[in-house]
Amino acid sequence: MICKNCGTEFEGNYCNQCGQKATVGRLTWKSVGDNLLHGIFHVDNTFVKTTRMLIVHPDRLLSDYFEGRRKGYMAPIPLLAVWCVILLFFGHIKGLPGSISTLETSAMHNWIVEHYTLLTIATVPFMVLAVKIAFRKAGSARYNWVEYLLGCCYLSVLYILLSLVLIPVGWVLDASYYQAYQWGSMVLSLIPTYWAAYSLFPDKFWITLRRTLWAVVLYLLFFTVIGGALIYPFVD
């Protein structure tokens, strides 16, 4: 077979000289869309596949990634970064007048929003430490720090997906329900947390739930004390 890109003769699915695919079809709307996504975000069908697997089978995704079966999956940090950008885009949309989305926010909140991607990635170690402590009796030592860091990056994507579901509610819900909206969001965030915890450390429901709640408390403590102390000097 002759490569259409460099003219090298080769066998297989890819040219061993320039990496061009063996089968290059005509340009279509689908191919243009795929190239556009890949060019702007460096995202292709692995983005959709990884996100879907993260929602439906997080245990299989983490198992595959940790055991080296990574072909076809998008790496956790780029996946998290892309979803952060998507969340920021929708988070800046204002809804109906008087809705939660139109409320004035504090300087601390504004700073967090402006640096959301960096902050999300930077707080992953707090999540890792909380999980290692809360699930130590469930065998948390079986995974190393790097595996936990990348696994928690995937978990952070689940939180972002939940936020994307809740944002439209803030566009229409009256601002007087802000506290209820916040508490509801916190309670719902336990669902992906428990789902991920059970995927890594399967056990009885109440045992996993208790450890999950303990991990959440530890994470909030670490984030408030350590994260708050580091962030405060940068807030105007």
PLM feature spans:
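Membrane-proximal intrinsically disordered regions of secretory-pathway and membrane-system proteins
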Residues: M1-D236
